[in-house]
Amino acid sequence: VTGPALAEAPAPVVPSPAPRRPRARTGRRWWRLASPVALVVAWEAAARSGLLAAEKLPAPSTVLATGARLAADGTLGTHLLDSLTRAALGLLIGGGLALALGAAAGLLRLGDDLVDPPVQMARMLPHLGLVPLLIIWVGIGESLKVTLVALGAFFPIYFNLYAGIRDIDERLVEAARTCGLGAAARLRHVVLPGALPALFLGLRLAIGAAWLSLVVGEQVNAQTGVGFLMMEAREFSQTDVVVLGLLVYALLGLASDLLIRYAERRTLTWRRGLRAT
């Protein structure tokens, strides 16, 4: 085959992926809302018909009216801000420590030998069961609540980051080394992209564990927070306020998870995962 013949050969045509139909995406969003809406409608109907006693489980409309009243007088906003502050501090402390130790254990042999064994032993202990000991160590004030959130967030991030680093194909690292990439470049272009999917999964699990820990922490000698609001309402049999607190926690967890998933999609644009059909 001559040179001109090669030059005139047409380039192979690579089919572009079919664009997703906006109408299909919109329809799927409506389907995702169908089951929660149906559940709320059934709950409202059962409460209004008397199948559910109001003192046991008030109607959603009653809970929303209570929420509007507490939001209007500033009560809900004050307690919500305190809960968000505790959750943010705990996530920052627990997540930062998990990132540092997970990276050390995943990247360094010495770090694996020194860090991973005690962490593996500590994860067998239910951190919520450590409340009596934590009260002795850090007191019964704000430190206890932040520590519980930090412990809840630490383990999911640590183990997913550790597993994400260890699951990277070593041949990719060797290929990068052969191409002349230094340690920092290999970390940036090979290790970090390979570990990010697992890290985002760990973040999503950590968010859930953090809110669960905060629910418990705010019921131990708290003076503010959504958990305190629920405990105070329980003393006066205000079931609507208790259910409102649970709803606030659920919405906070959902909003946090959606935020992490959005950041994951924006960060991992190169990753094509399996889509549900």
Feature annotation, model-predicted:
Residues P19-R25, S49-I93:
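Periplasmic/extracellular loop-to-transmembrane helix junction in inner-membrane transport proteins
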Residues R109, R166, L201, V243-T277:
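C-terminal transmembrane helix and the adjacent membrane-cytosol boundary/short C-terminal tail
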Residues Q120-P156, A163-G164:
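Generic hydrophobic transmembrane alpha-helix motif, especially the helices
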Residues P117, N160, G164-L205, V226, ...:
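Short cytoplasmic-facing helical segments at TM-TM junctions of multi-pass membrane proteins
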Residues L76-L80, L84, L114-A122, L161, ...:
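Hydrophobic alpha-helical elements at and bordering transmembrane segments
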Residues V1-V37, L258-T277:
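Transmembrane alpha-helical segments of polytopic membrane transport and secretion proteins
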Residues T147, L151, A183-G217, D240, ...:
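Transmembrane alpha-helices
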